[in-house]
Amino acid sequence: MGKLKLGILGNGYLADIIVEAGLKGMLDEYELVGVLGRTREKTELLAKKGGCRACSTIDELLALAPDYVAEAASVQSVKDCGVKILASGASMIVLSIGAFADKEFYGQVKETAAVHGTRVYIASGAVGGFDVLRTISLMGQAEAGIRTKKGPASLKGTPLFEERLMEDTQ
């Protein structure tokens, strides 16, 4: 049996980590076939680095017949592309799990995966982070903050987003 085909949805910091893992031999059972991102230039640079195709649309990425698509983009990307990815026969690895806060969308994803025999894998780092936050919240008074390398626009459509996040604070 040959390598499993892997597509990446996103072209930022997290997508680069996936490409780097492949270059370091940590994903030997996978062949990176394509990258899809919002900005063409960044997508082309990441695809060149990973030795794969830079895609302009989700249809172009899915035409490469990936077995898995790793989402490393945003909640909105999951909502825009998730059902289509699963319906194509590819399973998804989702980092932006906030997309599933939308119960209607969650239902669509669950049904599509069941009908097409595909799966959704939620990155354990996100789940582990929630476990830590839950534990801290049970300890009484605690303060928490979020530090991210993603832009605040990536939080649009989530319960965390507030318009003031878009203001330049520097």
Language-model region placement:
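Active-site-lining helix/loop region of Rossmann-like oxidoreductase modules
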Residues: 9, 17, 121, 126-170
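Short active-site oxyanion
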Residues: 31-34, 65-67, 118-120
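Beta-loop-alpha module in the N-terminal Rossmann-like domain of NAD(P)-dependent dehydrogenases
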Residues: 56-87, 99-103
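General beta-strand structural signal in soluble alpha/beta enzymes
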Residues: 55, 71, 94, 120-124
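Short, ordered loop/turn segments at secondary-structure junctions
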Residues: 38-40, 97-100, 126-127
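A short helix->loop->beta-strand "cap" motif at the edges of active sites that frequently abuts
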Residues: 52, 88-90, 115-118
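Rossmann-fold NAD(P)-binding glycine/threonine-rich loop
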Residues: 97-118
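N-terminal Rossmann-like dinucleotide-binding module
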Residues: 1-46
